[in-house]
Amino acid sequence: PTMLEEAVKASLWQLAVYDEKELVAYIRLVGDGHSVIFVQDLLVRPDHQRQGIGRKLLTEALATFPNVYQRLLATERSEKNLAFYQSLGFVELSDQACTGMIYNN
């Protein structure tokens, strides 16, 4: 199996959306499901964007784990991404009483 196949198998939760037999959107969470979940992937094919599919997937994911203390994601910084995630209740870590860091090896 490839690294991607192993990563998908080890995921906490995932959901895919198909149009007929064609994959058009996918969300994948990692974490323990109790204290933390991390939105590892939220992908919507460009020709299916702006239709509410990503919003529905993320809403379903968050509703599946309502009592998790930390719900995190990391994404490319853009006004579009900021607006989308903020509309769903996410805030930037810099606005919180915590520090977000990444390890660069």
Task: Kindly label every feature range from the protein language model.
Residues 84-85, 90:
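Conserved active-site tyrosine of GNAT-family acetyltransferases
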Residues 16, 21-31, 35-43:
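Conserved beta-strand in the GNAT
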Residues 58, 63-76:
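Conserved GNAT acetyl-CoA-binding A-motif
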Residues 44, 50-63, 87:
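Conserved acetyl-CoA-binding loop-helix of GNAT-fold acetyltransferases
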